[in-house]
Amino acid sequence: MSNEFKIKNIKAIGLEVPITNLSTPPESLPYYQELKNIVFGSYKSVIVEVEEEGGIKGFGECMTRIAPSALIDIIYEVMKPIAVGKDPLEHDLIWEEIYGVMRQRGHSKGFYIEALSGLDIAIWDLAGKLLHKPVSKLLGGKFHEKLECYASSIRFKKPEDVVTEVQKVLQEGFGKVKLKIGRGVDEDIAAVKAVRDNFGDMIKIMVDANSGYNVNSALQVGKKLEKYEVLWFEEPIPPDNIPGYAELSRTLDIPIAAGESEFTRYGFRELIERGGIKVLQPNVGRAGGFTELKKILSISSAYGIPYAPHTGSSSAVTMAAEMQLAANSPDFLIYEYMNNAWSHEQPNPLNYDLLNEKISPPVNGYLTVGDADGIGISLNKDTIKKYLI
């Protein structure tokens, strides 16, 4: 084992930004009222800081939708004792040891893997900084200097309001946009039809139901969407209904996209082999970090399935990490650029103020991937102090 570098310390930093003016989720979504109060009441993040003996620090992010304290406790009580003293260049060994400790004890998904994901991203970021290389090079090199983006997401609105939002997206240089659906067949189709009628082929459309349908209603919606040349139908049903995904994939002519709710190569193997999805959407801060995403993307590549990273409402740390991973993937399809926060009146400051190095917005629908060490970031101390839990 190499003793050239050693991890000296690990910190878990919980951040929360209350949302004061929030749009209510549509009543068609399962437990919509609970979603509003628990999930959508604030922007949350857990940032992981890994420090090497020489004082160099790497940063990662755990996908955090609820209970940041759970992630923080897992990192401190389970993962820190294992990782401290290890060589950050031996990320695979660290990952497997941490995963293996709890795998047989019922913790192969959920908070445990989200915590491991954030830690793993931070270790890779640290490794890149120690070696003075971007993570994309450590992963094997850049296939893409620029990443095509789609605008995400136009949320639940009346058709005329959706048209207004799409006009803004076009003016910002995007050629593709994702619409949130899940309100019911008639309302969903009316919104998609309004966009297609007003803009024709000027804009490409994806739709995302966030698991708002069952198989029967998803089939109804999907059949009606086919005539509007929708690029993909995302998370039409709950993520644990693998047979349902298989039925939708067999029956509909629209590619089924999923993956933001899945964990590790084992979960994605089932989603791909049994679920038959056509677009893979893992989140690096949930599915297992860089170490595990390399394995996941090897499986999807063998099946010829394109990769469209999920960023969602995570912070700029996840954005930076996903850019490095996407640049390295020969199967990269398109990048989710969140130009619409959960609250239009209150953009997420963890996207714009958290980093000292700002991520430049897309130009004509493309992001440029940088070559800075690691994932190319450091944290703004004032923002951390302001939103620290």
Where are these regions (language model features)?
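Structured beta-strand/loop patches that form or line metal/cofactor-binding pockets in enzymes
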Residues: 2-54, 59, 63, 352-353
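Conserved, mostly hydrophobic/aromatic
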Residues: 7, 55, 79, 119, ...
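Metal- or metallocofactor-binding catalytic centers and their adjacent structured scaffolds
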Residues: 9, 51-130, 345-346
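Shared catalytic-loop signature of beta/alpha-barrel
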Residues: 26-29, 223, 229, 240-257, ...
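Hydrophobic faces of well-ordered beta-strands that scaffold small-molecule active sites
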Residues: 58, 149-152, 177-179, 205-209, ...
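C-terminal extensions of enzymes
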Residues: 345-389
